[in-house]
């Protein structure tokens, strides 16, 4: 089967880029995949979309559309699979890709909490247009599922992010005391960094390790000595540092289905995460503590709840089991393959 995948590749690293690499590995020998790379370029690659300059963005859009149209005109594509963050500029590009799809079978994959992204009349209209045109829409969580259902009658599937089975730890050695808590991701206000800093003022016996590119807005905040900023690290470096921690803290204000949180679960770490996106569905009530967004007090209380070694050991064991049973890459990839074949059945039968 020939698949045209419209999706970012690293650099820079990110949730969708990691997903794309994983998909290409799993597709090897199964699908013939043609990839159109939608990754940020220039300053946007360095600042993860914070700075948008018109000319570089026009150049990027032209390059993406040029590659997309060339593949469509030179290859007999069976399925177009578009990965999207549903951002303001991204949804416009996605709509253009859909408009030029030439009646090809289409899977639109939303890597976000859709209702948090499609704000405003134009974005909503573009989203509805794409949903109606797609053969199937993939979403990450229940809220996004309901949102698409409210706009379109298109088939909707909840497809979780996945992790390579060889990256799932066989076991995790739980320390006697809770001394090191790690956060991995963009270090900015909307990721709950201010709340981490405030919680650290109360939990002085714990070190908070913050790994990821640091926004200017955070650099101006005075933080206590037990908060350590590491800046941007490679994926391998970040994962190595994560595995040395006693717990993973993820107080983001909004989320789809966090790859880094999935990686923390696969490492066997107990989780403290906000009730946004798929976070609560992932750890349920046994893999960690779910807290309200923008509450340093709840972070402090959650930390106290997981201090006992026995509690953290049970959470670790449960998270490893959950990842193995629900998020292995081979199982998730099989679901995607099944959808491809379902939407292409009429064509295959006519052949």
Cite the ranges covered by each PLM segment.
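Aromatic "clamp/platform" in nucleotide-sugar-dependent glycosyltransferases that forms part
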Residues: 253
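Short hydrophobic beta-strand element within catalytic cores of glycosyltransferases
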Residues: 270-273
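Nucleotide-activated donor-binding/catalytic signature segment of Leloir-type glycosyltransferases, i.e.
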Residues: 218-236
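A short, well-ordered alpha-helix in the C-terminal region of glycosyltransferases
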Residues: 311-326
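Conserved donor-binding/catalytic core segment of Leloir-type glycosyltransferases
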Residues: 4-5, 163, 173-191, 197-203, ...
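Conserved acidic donor-binding segment of nucleotide-sugar-dependent glycosyltransferases
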Residues: 285, 289-296, 305-310
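Short alpha-helical donor nucleotide-sugar binding micro-motif in glycosyltransferases
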Residues: 232-233, 240-245
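Donor nucleotide-sugar binding/catalytic pocket of nucleotide-sugar-dependent glycosyltransferases
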Residues: 132-169
């Amino acid at each position: 089967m020939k698949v045209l995948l419209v999706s970012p590749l690293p650099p820079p690293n990110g949730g969708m880029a990691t997903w794309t690499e994983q998909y290409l590995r799993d597709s090897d020998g199964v699908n013939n995949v043609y990839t159109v790379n939608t990754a940020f370029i220039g300053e946007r690659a360095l600042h993860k979309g914070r700075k948008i300059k018109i000319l570089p963005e026009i150049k990027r859009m032209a390059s993406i559309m040029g590659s997309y149209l060339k593949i469509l005109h030179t290859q007999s594509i069976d399925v177009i699979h578009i990965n999207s963050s549903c951002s303001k500029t991204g949804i416009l590009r996605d709509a253009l890709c859909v408009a030029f799809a030439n009646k090809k079978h289409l899977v639109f994959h939303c890597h976000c909490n859709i209702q948090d992204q499609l704000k405003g009349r134009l974005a909503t209209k573009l989203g509805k247009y794409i949903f109606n045109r797609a053969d199937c829409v993939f979403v990450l969580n229940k809220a996004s599922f309901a949102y698409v259902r409210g706009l379109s009658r298109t088939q909707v599937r909840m497809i979780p992010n996945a992790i390579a089975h060889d990256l799932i730890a066989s076991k995790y050695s739980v320390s006697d005391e809770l001394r090191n808590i790690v956060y991995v991701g963009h270090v900015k206000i909307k990721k709950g960094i201010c709340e981490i800093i405030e919680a650290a003022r109360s939990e002085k016996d714990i070190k908070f390790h913050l790994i990821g590119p640091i926004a200017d807005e955070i650099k101006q905040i005075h933080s206590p000595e037990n908060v350590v900023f590491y800046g941007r690290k490679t994926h391998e470096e970040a994962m190595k540092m994560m595995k040395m921690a006693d717990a993973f803290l993820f107080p983001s204000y909004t989320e789809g289905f966090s790859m880094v949180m999935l990686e923390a679960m696969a490492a066997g770490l107990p989780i403290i995460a906000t009730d946004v996106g798929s976070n609560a569905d992932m750890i349920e009530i046994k893999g960690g503590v779910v807290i309200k967004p923008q509450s340093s007090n709840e972070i402090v209380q959650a930390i106290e709840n997981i201090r006992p070694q026995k509690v953290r050991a049970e959470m670790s064991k449960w998270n490893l089991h959950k990842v193995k049973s629900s998020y292995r890459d081979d199982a998730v990839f099989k679901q995607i393959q099944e959808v491809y074949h379902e939407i292409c059945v009429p064509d295959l039968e006519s052949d």
